[in-house]
Amino acid sequence: MLREFDAPLTVYVASDFAEGAGRLWWTALEAVIARTDQIDVQIGHSALRLDASTPAAKQAAFDRLHDWLRALPGEHDLNREIEALCTNYGVDMEALCRSLCLSWDEVKTLAADPLVTIGAHTVSHSNLAKQTEEIAAREMAVSRARIEQALERPVLHFAYPYGDRDAAGEREFALAAAAGFKTAVTTRPGMLFAENAGHMTALPRVSLNGNYQDARILPVLTSGAATAMWNGFRRIAAA
């Protein structure tokens, strides 16, 4: 479809995913919930049993566990808890990664299309704001180096994992600039203005993900009206 309309696109690659070793923890959580009618989990000092016997109950369980995992203080905490859930309910995270993510050969095929730009997306899809400055910088640099080695071309663009205010802020914007990325995108909703030229590693995006969206709403989203209200009519949200 994009080729038909001569529309360029950028694909941001987390290098562990292309190597088949990534942790798609949110997808693993879906797989855990899909294969059981109830989930036993220890959250803090409380042992919980969550109903997962109906589609609605599964969605509620996913929302509860997803929010808990995202709120854990460190990446190692999240990894520990999702690994325990996967072990208890027989989900192989690496097999999920290999089946769902592009391999390096597939990334190379995609990158050969002149409409396609490949950007970096860290090594492990880590929440950079929860990492030390050293680790966050390394996640950016190593991801970029691995992609450049695989594709034999420079990688100039970056996308922050998760990309919201809890995952990317002023420190991360500065790290991306220091790493030499020409642009870096968040998931903060917003349109592009001339003022964004001074904040090229803190760019907003308009999310067309199908959630609460249909063809009638698309003109509103692309007009900038919705994101203007979201941002309190500020053109730049780079702090």
What is each residue range found by the language model?
Residues 21-41, 48, 112-113, 126, ...:
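C-terminal active-site subregion of NodB/CE4 polysaccharide deacetylases
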Residues 22-113:
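Extended, charge-rich helix/loop segments that form flexible
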Residues 19, 91-92, 97, 106-108, ...:
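Homeobox/homeodomain signature
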Residues 1-30:
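Long, hydrophobic, well-ordered secondary-structure blocks that form the structural core
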Residues 14-16, 123, 189:
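Histidine-centered beta-alpha loop that forms part of the nucleotide-sugar donor binding/catalytic region
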Residues 3-12, 67-94, 117-122, 126, ...:
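CE4/NodB-like, metal-dependent polysaccharide N-deacetylase domain
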